[in-house]
């Protein structure tokens, strides 16, 4: 146990801390492990803010293909400006203390979803992402369990959600409302820092055998382990480009698609619809974006190999192929 503490103490430098923890691990009576209890940090500072005063602000943070395969790029600076819009919108609509608030979102894995999540992280708002195609009954179960103050979705789903908001005491908002905002640069506020064990986000199990169970992820240990595994298992560095074919409703959509790559300062390639990779022409276009790390569901890899053969993956830029 002592070696475990010493090991992770030596890895603290992998991320930025406002207050570096002195309590590395504490095991309480219920056998729950609490990591870095007295440490303080803000994950948004690790992912975005520490790039803005350097030349890396002009570096491509996200390469993004929409559901219709339209392609966009966002530098760290451009991504930050988009996050500011969502930060401003959340500050305006949340009446209670931001760091005590909870937000649930139902959306596909698109750039607006990413900006909303990063705004939540910056403000200390615990969030929960659910699959865009999850049935109304499944969404309602998660609302009852998570008890959000705000539910975020698109206009199409807003009508079905609104009928529950009075009973379950939340307000419902649409991504389209944020689109209407003009300049929100004045929303830059002093950055707050949070204890390492503060809840960052909650993801629910499928609930296929009963009620879904919420798995809560904190910030310090989550980010540190993510960075450690990306560097040591994936071989990621600042020159990497990673494609994690995941959904924002899965854990891999948070650690290896979003927070990890942005924290390291590399480029993450995000697909709104990963199954589009089964289209040969689209797969070719994606892999030509200088992907160095390809992280896919093992089932998808098998299907793609059966359709295209192994040579389709063997681009000169590709260094690591991983499966989830």
Language-model segments: which ranges?
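N-lobe entry segment of adenylate-forming
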Residues: 1-74, 78-85, 91, 193
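ANL superfamily AMP-binding
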Residues: 45, 57-58, 77-104, 112, ...
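Conserved AMP-binding A3 loop
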Residues: 73-76, 200-224
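Conserved structural elements of the adenylate-forming
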Residues: 80-86, 215-235
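Conserved AMP-binding/adenylate-forming
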Residues: 89-133, 241-248
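Conserved adenylate-forming
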Residues: 136, 144-149, 156-176, 238-239, ...
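Conserved AMP-binding/adenylation subdomain of ANL enzymes
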Residues: 223-241, 251-292, 306-308
């Amino acid at each position: 146990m002592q070696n475990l503490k010493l090991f992770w103490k030596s890895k603290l430098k992998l991320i930025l801390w406002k207050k570096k923890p002195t309590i590395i691990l504490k095991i309480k009576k219920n056998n729950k492990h609490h990591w870095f209890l007295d440490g303080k940090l803000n994950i948004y500072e690790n992912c975005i803010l520490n790039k803005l005063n350097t030349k890396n602000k002009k570096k491509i943070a996200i390469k993004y293909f929409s559901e219709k395969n339209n392609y966009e790029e966002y530098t760290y600076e451009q991504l930050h400006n988009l996050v500011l819009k969502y930060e401003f919108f959340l500050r305006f609509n949340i009446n209670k203390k931001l760091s005590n608030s909870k937000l649930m979102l139902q959306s596909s894995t698109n750039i607006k979803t990413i900006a909303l999540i990063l705004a939540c992280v910056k403000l200390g708002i615990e969030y929960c992402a659910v699959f865009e195609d999850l049935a109304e009954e499944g969404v309602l179960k998660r609302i009852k369990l998570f008890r959000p103050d705000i539910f975020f979705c698109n206009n199409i789903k807003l009508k079905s959600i609104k009928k529950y908001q009075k009973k379950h005491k939340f307000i419902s908002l649409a991504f389209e409302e944020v689109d209407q905002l003009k300049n929100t640069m004045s929303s830059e506020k002093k950055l707050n820092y949070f204890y390492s064990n503060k809840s960052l986000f909650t993801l629910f199990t499928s609930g296929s055998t009963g009620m879904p169970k919420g798995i809560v992820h904190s910030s310090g240990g989550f980010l540190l382990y993510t960075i450690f595994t990306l560097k040591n298992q994936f071989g990621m560095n600042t020159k990497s480009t990673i494609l994690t074919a995941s959904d924002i409703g899965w854990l891999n959509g948070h650690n290896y698609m979003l927070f990890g790559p942005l924290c390291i300062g590399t480029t993450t390639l995000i697909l709104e619809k990963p199954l589009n990779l089964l289209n040969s022409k689209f797969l070719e276009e994606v892999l030509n974006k200088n992907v160095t790390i390809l992280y896919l569901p093992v089932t998808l890899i098998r299907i793609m190999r059966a359709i295209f053969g192994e040579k389709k993956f063997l681009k000169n830029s590709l260094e690591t192929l991983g499966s989830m």
